């Protein structure tokens, strides 16, 4: 994916605030052989790009001052309650750069699995993304998780995933975490309330 950035001359809180009022987003690009560079981007173009999954988990081509650089999205700051991007960080990469990045999981063949088709169970997606470590040029936009082999009582773990040899899942000390697990469908028990008898009417008192 490609996007355009512009060099940012003025810095500081006041300058960033004025940029945002003008429909721009302040940011920075760092890493590689170049120096950290303050940049600005068009807010609307960036906001719509951020809606695309690939913008978060793939190598991007940034055009800056007539030059093209390969970068990855590193950090993103959003407004607490408004749909506004406040700041964005990018890291320069090349074919020798080894990076750690979270990538989304795409689950496939769930409906065709024995767990769903025959055992009438549900498959719970325990995680929706995984952090991986690999060379930047090998960074996948997503990881495919095949659920077709699951049956009742089974779970799918990180070690069960079919990944390229160059890709390593970062588990942060957790041993073979669960990615998806089969759970039975629990039918709610309908409780029928016993009828309540109305109390007998007492005899009314006559008028004196």
Curated annotation (Swiss-Prot):
InterPro entries: Rbsml_bL25/Gln-tRNA_synth_N (IPR020056), Ribosomal_bL25/Gln-tRNA_synth (IPR011035), Ribosomal_bL25_b-dom (IPR020057), Ribosomal_bL25_C (IPR037121), Ribosomal_bL25_long (IPR001021), Ribosomal_bL25_short (IPR020055), Ribosomal_L25_dom (IPR029751), Ribosomal_uL5_bac-type (IPR020930). This is Large ribosomal subunit protein bL25. One of its GO terms (molecular function) is structural constituent of ribosome. CDD domains: Ribosomal_L25_TL5_CTC. Disulfide bonds: none annotated. GO terms for biological process: translation. This is one of the proteins that binds to the 5S RNA in the ribosome where it forms part of the central protuberance. Belongs to the bacterial ribosomal protein bL25 family. CTC subfamily. Part of the 50S ribosomal subunit; part of the 5S rRNA/L5/L18/L25 subcomplex. Contacts the 5S rRNA. Binds to the 5S rRNA independently of L5 and L18. Gene3D superfamilies: Ribosomal protein L25, beta domain (2.170.120.20), Ribosomal Protein L25, Chain P (2.40.240.10). GO terms for cellular component: cytosolic large ribosomal subunit. It comes from the Bacteria. SUPFAM superfamilies: Ribosomal protein L25-like (SSF50715). Keywords: Ribonucleoprotein, Ribosomal protein, RNA-binding, rRNA-binding. It holds the Pfam family Ribosomal_L25p.
């Amino acid at each position: 994916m490609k996007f355009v950035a512009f060099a940012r001359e003025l810095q500081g809180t006041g300058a960033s605030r004025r940029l945002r009022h003008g429909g721009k987003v302040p940011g920075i690009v760092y890493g590689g052989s170049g120096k950290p560079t303050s940049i600005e981007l068009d807010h609307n173009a960036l906001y719509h790009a951020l809606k695309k999954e690939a913008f978060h988990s793939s190598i991007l081509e940034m055009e800056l001052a007539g030059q093209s650089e390969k970068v990855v999205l590193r950090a993103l700051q959003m407004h607490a309650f408004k749909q506004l991007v406040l700041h964005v960080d990018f890291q320069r990469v090349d074919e020798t750069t080894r990076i750690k990045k979270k990538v989304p999981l795409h689950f496939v063949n769930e409906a065709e699995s024995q767990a769903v088709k025959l055992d009438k169970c549900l498959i719970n997606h325990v995680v929706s993304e995984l952090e991986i470590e690999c060379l930047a040029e090998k960074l996948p936009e997503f990881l495919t998780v095949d659920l077709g082999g699951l049956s009742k009582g089974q779970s799918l773990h990180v070690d069960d995933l079919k990944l390229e040899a160059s890709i390593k899942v970062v588990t942060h000390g957790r041993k073979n975490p669960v990615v998806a697990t089969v759970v039975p469908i629990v039918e709610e028990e309908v409780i029928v309330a016993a009828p309540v008898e109305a109390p007998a009417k007492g005899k009314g008192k006559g008028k004196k």
